Amino acid sequence: MKKQLHFTPQASDFLTEQSAAVQKAFFEKLKKLSDDGLLREPDAKKIAPNLFEIRVKVTRMQYRLFYCYIDENGIWVLSGFVKKTQKTPENEIRKAIRIRKGVE
């Protein structure tokens, strides 16, 4: 069943700041997420309860976009960041959880 995507201002701002190639890669995965209702590794990973990240790699740079499920048909895209270390930064996870609480 197709899911409705909703974007927070933080997610929209992050996406518009990225190059066309990064935007294209994210929107391809977001379309698949909307159409299928879920993404699996390596395209996405569960970070915390009801918090997932979409993973994109373009020209050796890694980008992440957090999302969550709010109801049966809704997916909220919360925030994004450029990944610079092996581990997802705790401050980015806390930020996404804080944003998620605002849309729940």
List the model feature ranges, each with a label.
Residues 65-66:
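Hydrophobic/aromatic beta-strand elements that line small-molecule binding cavities or substrate pockets
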